[in-house]
Amino acid sequence: MPNPKPLPPQSELDNIRRYNAQAIANYYRRRPWKVLWRALEVVWSFGFFLTCLLWDQWTGQVEYYKRQRAEDLRELLTKLGPTFIKVGQALSTRPDLVRRDFLEELIKLQDQLPPFDNDLAFQLMEEQLGMKVDEAYREISAHPVAAASLGQVYRAMLFSGEEVAVKVQRPNLRPRLSLDLYLMRLGAQKFGRFLPLNLGHDLTLIVDEFGIKLFEEIDYLNEGRNAEKFAENFHGDAEVKVPCIYWQYSNQKVLTLEWIQGFKLTDTDKIRAAGLDPSDIIRIGVTSGLRQLLEHGFFHADPHPGNLFATLDGRMAYIDFGMMDQLEPGTKETIASSIVQLINKDYLALTEDFIALGFLAPNTDITPIIPALENVFGSAIGQSVQDFNFKTITDDFSELMYDYPFRVPAKFALIIRSLVTQEGLALSLDPNFKIVEVAYPYVARRLLTGESPQLRRQLIDVLFKNGKFQWQRLENMLSIARSDTKFDLLPTAQLGLQFLFSEEGLYLRRQILLALTEDDRLHTDEVQRIWGLVKDDFKPQELVNVAWNAVREFSLAGVSTILPQR
């Protein structure tokens, strides 16, 4: 038998655990021949592609070759390797930077490459784990069961009997990524200021942010920690499955985790044959995605079909936690608010939320933007919220970005990608799926039951417009929230009354009293309609208990604050 191929020699760059632009620059300044050779390869590839685009313009055949050129770009990025595949995937979330025909093709960019040599993979396992492969695993597949741009996966069994997936990183990956990032950073420094891009930041900083995320993704210890944090967030949720990490068989370039028995979400026939209801899988996927964004703020940024499974017992399983991100607390509440503003068609409030989220600069003149949003979103939503389609909204919004000073913050590029992907997966299971039927009841319930000051402020902002109470909005929110079978109105009512009678609820008490008597009449009709919505959820004794629990700690001194002060 021939001797196995040796692993590539260890590079200085393998010792850089976190992205460090200065350390990478110092390394390649001493090795200009490596930089020159890779630069020639990249420039030649893109030069030929750009020449084709120019030729299409000169010959008036842009429309004829539009689809072909988009496919050429996808194939070019795949050929240039892992870094450029990741760049293409990042650009597929940026409708403010990439025209639609290229965007649609980049979305198809698969994070797949042919597997690398098994001998190299097993050598890397032994080097990382400090033991022979047959000492770590009782059994292991002879060939990888999956291969991607950054690594490949084997199926194995531990001596204790657990089935596991063993994820092994591609050899020499860190130096390859570092060289491409160094070239991108050089290009950003030299040419970034000449590019007509609405980025909101210096292009060099964007390359650095991309490098930070890429280095996090190739640190398998970091991925394991992400998986455990994700599992902790969903602890007690019987509908979401997260694989266990086996730390004694894991290191920076090898990760051993629980093998998930189930079906990819694209295997609709197998899902149905197993007796699983696709509509339940869809509901779990959308709800868990919303919980990540609006409750935990820690979200899976790469939910493509290979990373989501329906388990045999009907749960949603997440795998591959290399690409995760964290939202700030205030951002979660603003996202919830913007969804409600969109459904309520309050485009002034929606524009203000866009400013708060960073889609628009604070000094932007929003006067022409409000009717533009109404034109785009109004037609996309249609006459009913049931017509809401996130992909349509995203496509129409991408057109708007070329005419107005919108930019997509990096975090929201990942969120948009995540939501579009999840909606696409849901539609593959059920072509009649409407994301709003799951999402809006959850958001309404989240606002109605939120205990944080930020969520309470958002609820007040939604229910009051120009100082007037919006009875119809409260009625809509209660009606839609009750369509969620998990919504329990009793705790919500108790929370609401506790807040209403608290010191923080002073403003709300006064506004409700004014709302009940505004326009010189008592608004008994509105109150009766709302009572008609909720009365079936209350028994008389329960209602008394809720009211008593809310007011029993309310001081006599606080009674005077219920009434408006003269």
From Swiss-Prot:
One example GO MF annotation: protein kinase activity
Record lineage: Bacteria, Bacillati, Cyanobacteriota, Cyanophyceae, Synechococcales
Gene3D superfamilies in the record: Transferase(Phosphotransferase) domain 1
InterPro entries in the cross-refs: ABC1_dom, Kinase-like_dom_sf, Prot_kinase_dom, UbiB_kinase
SUPFAM superfamilies named in the record: Protein kinase-like (PK-like)
Pfam families per UniProt: ABC1
Family under the similarity heading: Belongs to the protein kinase superfamily. ADCK protein kinase family.
Protein name according to UniProt: Uncharacterized protein slr1919
Organism expressing this protein natively: Synechocystis sp. (strain ATCC 27184 / PCC 6803 / Kazusa)
Domain of life: Bacteria
